[in-house]
Amino acid sequence: MTEKQWKKNDETEILIEDMGKDGEGIGHADGYTLFVKGALPGERVRVRLMKVKKRMGFARLMEVITPSSQRVTPVCPVAGPCGGCTLQHLSYEAQLEVKENTVRNCLQRIGGVDLEKVEWLPIQGMNGENESPWHYRNKAQFPVRMGKDGKAEAGFFASGSHRLIPVESCQIQHPVINEVLAVVMDFLREKGIEGYDEEHHSGLVRHIFIRRGYFTGQVMVCLVLMKETLPEEAVLLERLKKVEGFTSLYISVNSRRTNVILGEDVRLRFGKAYIEDEIGGVRYQISPKSFYQVNPVQTQKLYARALDFAGLQGHETVWDLYCGIGTISLFLAKAVPQGKVVGVEIVPEAVENARENAKLNGFENVSFRCGAAEDVAPGLLEKYGADVVVVDPPRKGCDGSLLETMVSMAPEKIVYVSCDPATLARDVKRLGEMGYELKRCQVTDMFPQGGHCETVCEMEREDK
């Protein structure tokens, strides 16, 4: 029998069998794999093929013929086209189940892990007392473009494109962030200030970047401009001062053709150079370029679990690789008052922030080094030793050379904090081949309504 040759705009009916890592439904048409945004497992749907590759295709959801019992009506009116939330159409309980299953499947399929031998702790969701899977984010980056009415509009890009989906507020951002967005956009439209035109590389305002300290309520606003001057800036400043918690106004000049949001030139125009926030009794200073987790409520749970998995008694030497501004490092330093924490980070500004944060909290048992961990660690190992290594890499996971370095340090435990189940599974397999066994694991839902999650794994040296 000849295999059907699918082409763009073909329509077909399929059963959704599974869900991908980004929340897309997965089904098959005559053996051909199709990814369908907005479709849920168990649903029979009609789809139209939009992109056809040799082994798989991407299709648009045209009709849900048989809906899932877990399908819900999205709260946000642009949940479908917007690239921000991929799971608003799925009940929150089902979102948690999908995320946990995704991690388990990756560890089994890619990592070759026998889950019967792993202690699996239930996923940490935002469904506890006084918690909500809405309005949890402490950071927003709104691109600004020109609308059809000739005035500036802000929003988010449609998935996989730079087509702006205009929004007036976002259901996963803190209400104060939405208030700031409204203040800035009312000002831009009132004064006739242009948004960025990506095609012609013209206009003035490229992005509105807002951060808020969840536990302090402090608010930072950064406007990313093509030029250094914002017309009638003083008027906007007076309006922003009426927002509860408003602390800082920055202007970032970015005149390059680039997808990078902030320019090299970031200037403080009003207030403090940073805002502060707190996680588990540790305070942090956050500047426009600082990496800081977007969901502090879940971050506190995540770090508490990492600390639990580390099993610290108070005297150990702990290494924190990819330490950023020291968020996990300072958590660890608090737990080893008679011990030592060494944080390693390749971004110089983050290392400077980490040192300032240690000083802010009065920690003298933590130090930070700038460089690649595989270069920094060997030279300091004889001086400090290593009882526990904590690693929190980006989505790409750890380079092979870093894994080898970690193993050569011979810690009793490795605590791996991951934001990507596939690369986590790959690295768990590599570490297993080098003598470290996966003992305990827990998923934390850092991004309700979205497809991503964080996982903490405890790995123990087999010959200890």
For each predicted feature, which ranges?
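Short, acidic/hydrophobic/Gly-rich beta-strand patch recurrent on exposed beta strands
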Residues: 25-30, 155-158, 222-224, 354
